[in-house]
Amino acid sequence: MKLGINIDHIATLRNARGQGNPSILRALKVCEKAKVDTLTVHLREDRRHINDNDLKLLKKNARIPINLEMALTDEMIAISKRIKPNFICLVPENRNEITTEGGLNLEKISKKKLKSLLTVCHSNGIELSAFINPNKKAIELAKKFKFQTVELHTGSLDKKKINNRDKENINNMINFASKMNLKVNIGHGLNFSNIKFIKSRKKIDTVHIGHFIISEAIFLSLHETIKKFQRII
């Protein structure tokens, strides 16, 4: 598996003081030195953490691929056309949420906007994925709507007592998506402990980690936390 690091919460910490520290460009350089495979940022409608200038700076300076998480809106489609990230992952957004609470409901998305985004992606060599719940219906819809990749929501593993049904389901859905000829990524709530429940690792392209990595970095340093996770996967 490859490792993608989400640095949104470095921007959250920076924004708490409204100045320039901690620097997202410094975080980028640490990630590159640690040989991270992908850098992920979520440009939210409310600009809660990453902002437009951050995205420009990262795209200009990054030597590793940029994965842009975004909602399916006209504004974000225009931004993606201008910035041209390497990857785009469509995610749900709710202004009142603390973090992403579940996968994107593909039945309810605008097919007109999706068609527009697919045109942007095809014209610029951008790989498009959808962040979805780990169930067959969502995976089948992703295939139907011509997504190249799915990122399966692993939040069911982020609790003190994880039941066997959740462990089995996420692994079964990884295998199911792979059989549908979709590239499979996973993310949300993963840490040093629960990543061990992911058994179908050969079917996974990239595991995306954000909040946990940044939290552990307070104690271990960002570089050492990344290296430890790489050793585990």
Residue ranges with predicted function:
Residues 1-85, 141-144, 162-165:
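Conserved N-terminal beta1-alpha1 strand-loop-helix module at the mouth
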Residues 3-7, 39-41, 66-70, 88-90, ...:
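Hydrophobic faces of well-ordered beta-strands that scaffold small-molecule active sites
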Residues 35-37, 61-64, 82-88, 123, ...:
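Glycine-enriched alpha-helix->loop->beta-strand junction motifs that scaffold or abut catalytic
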Residues 48-74, 107-129, 164-188, 192, ...:
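Alpha-helix-loop-beta-strand connector modules within alpha/beta enzyme cores
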Residues 59, 102, 162-163, 215-233:
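C-terminal helical cap(s) of enzyme catalytic domains, especially alpha/beta-barrels
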Residues 74-84, 135-145, 184-186, 190-204:
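Catalytic cores of alpha/beta
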Residues 89-97, 148-160, 203-222:
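Glycine-rich phosphate-binding active-site loops on the catalytic face of alpha/beta enzymes
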Residues 127-176:
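Histidine/lysine/aspartate-rich catalytic loop segments that bind and position anionic ligands
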